[in-house]
């Protein structure tokens, strides 16, 4: 029996698959993420998702492997995960009072085919005070999240508006993923 393998150690992606009753196992991709010369954020996230899934699929060719990647962009600037407090504060100051875009790319690899897709969501932040930013950064929540915030956590209080898929901002566009899995004869809507 084919298994679904999530090529990610992200606790948020794990929670979203569990929420949707998708049966899966985790094999963390150890691939070094490389961003080449891509023309768009959507190309970047789909390429990174494919890199992660491909690395795990090499040793799991009889199964279905899922890879995903999320980035935040503001005015053509890519905001990944912050490497320190100053970088986290800088990102949050940049996003304060403005609308930014969150892209999550997904790759599904199986013997018979490979599917990649992405979702784009616009998120608008309230104006943030320096104290709000300092307190949030001190909580350590920003450090494993693209754009330095978690919409599903304490960072939720910064969000004024969202246009698009909330779960994509969390890290996995689960409704779209469930529909795409039907191409691989996986239907969790009747489970």
Swiss-Prot record:
It catalyses: dTTP + H2O = dTMP + diphosphate + H(+); UTP + H2O = UMP + diphosphate + H(+). Gene3D superfamilies: 3.90.950.10. The record marks 12, 70, 152 as: Important for substrate specificity. It comes from the Bacteria. It is found in: Cytoplasm. Keywords: Cytoplasm, Hydrolase, Nucleotide metabolism. Its cofactor is a divalent metal cation. GO terms for molecular function: dTTP diphosphatase activity; nucleoside triphosphate diphosphatase activity; UTP diphosphatase activity. GO terms for biological process: nucleotide metabolic process. Its EC number is 3.6.1.9. Belongs to the Maf family. YhdE subfamily. Nucleoside triphosphate pyrophosphatase that hydrolyzes dTTP and UTP. May have a dual role in cell division arrest and in preventing the incorporation of modified nucleotides into cellular nucleic acids. This is dTTP/UTP pyrophosphatase. It comes from Bacillus cereus (strain ATCC 14579 / DSM 31 / CCUG 7414 / JCM 2152 / NBRC 15305 / NCIMB 9373 / NCTC 2599 / NRRL B-3711).
């Amino acid at each position: 029996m084919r298994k679904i393998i999530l090529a990610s150690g992200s606790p948020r992606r794990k929670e979203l698959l569990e929420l949707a009753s998708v049966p899966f196992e985790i094999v963390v991709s150890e691939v070094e993420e490389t961003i080449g010369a891509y023309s768009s954020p959507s190309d970047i996230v789909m390429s990174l998702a494919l890199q992660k899934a491909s690395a795990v699929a090499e040793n799991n060719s009889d199964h279905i492997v899922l890879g995903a990647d999320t980035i935040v962009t503001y005015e053509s600037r890519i905001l990944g995960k912050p490497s320190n407090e100053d970088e986290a504060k800088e990102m949050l100051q940049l996003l304060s009072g403005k609308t930014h875009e969150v892209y999550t790319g997904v790759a599904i690899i199986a013997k018979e085919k490979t599917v990649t897709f992405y979702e784009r969501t616009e998120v608008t932040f309230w104006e943030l005070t320096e104290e709000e930013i300092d307190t949030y950064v001190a909580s350590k929540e920003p450090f494993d999240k693209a754009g330095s915030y978690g919409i599903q956590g304490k960072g939720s209080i910064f969000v004024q508006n969202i246009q698009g898929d909330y779960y994509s901002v969390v890290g996995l566009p689960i409704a779209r993923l469930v529909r795409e899995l039907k191409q691989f004869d996986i239907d969790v809507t009747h489970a």
